[in-house]
């Protein structure tokens, strides 16, 4: 469904800002008609910080990979800023886990986890049943246990914050279920980077 969504979007000439917004804000079942965009986050299941790095590079041209672990030595990004952005998409999970959990429990009780049947059940869970996305982002996140700078403490809860374009923030005291939607709105409507990146890429493709 995710690949089909991408193909259909290109075939129907969906505007770039609408396409990006759907990728960043979609939720629910990826098997629902027209909802394949949830695959953007499901594809990186278990790797939300890597997803944030990719998102910033794809849609804004900002290279934040280094700032995931330390202040970047060759650009402006600091580790605290990386986590402030990651807060907007933090806290997503699969929905409707119950039915598959019941099946997997039976497989486990029968000690069939490593059998061909067990591997098939696991694959179906990961690639079919769990092609879903719940949660609108918490809008807050804990700094990692190895956080090493004076602007935060290991394990400290921080709220979301953008650092260019329109400034948006979220609280570090309570979850904000609109955080991911707010992040998507900011991405496509509130910063010049989003526009310049796609223009530069199209120019390079045309002009070589």
Question: Could you say what each language-model-derived stretch is?
Answer:
Residues 171-173:
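Flexible, polar/acidic helix-loop-strand segments at domain edges
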């Amino acid at each position: 469904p995710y690949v089909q969504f991408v193909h259909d979007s290109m075939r129907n000439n969906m505007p770039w800002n609408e396409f990006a917004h759907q990728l960043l804000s979609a939720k629910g079942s990826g098997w629902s008609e027209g909802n394949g965009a949830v695959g953007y986050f499901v594809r990186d299941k278990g790797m939300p910080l890597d997803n944030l790095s990719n998102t910033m590079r794809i849609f804004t041209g900002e290279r934040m990979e280094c700032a995931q672990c330390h202040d970047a030595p060759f650009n402006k990004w600091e580790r605290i800023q990386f986590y402030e952005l990651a807060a907007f998409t933090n806290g997503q999970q699969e929905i409707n886990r119950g039915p598959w959990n019941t099946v997997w429990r039976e497989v486990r009780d029968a000690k069939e986890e490593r059998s061909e049947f067990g591997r098939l059940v696991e694959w179906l869970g990961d690639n079919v049943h769990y092609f879903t996305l719940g949660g609108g982002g918490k809008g807050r996140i804990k700094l990692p246990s190895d956080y090493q700078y004076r602007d935060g403490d290991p394990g400290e809860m921080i709220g979301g914050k953008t650092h260019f374009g329109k400034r948006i923030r979220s609280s570090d005291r309570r979850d904000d279920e609109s955080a991911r939607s707010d992040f998507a709105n900011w991405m496509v409507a509130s910063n010049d980077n989003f526009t310049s990146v796609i223009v530069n890429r199209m120019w390079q493709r045309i002009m070589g």
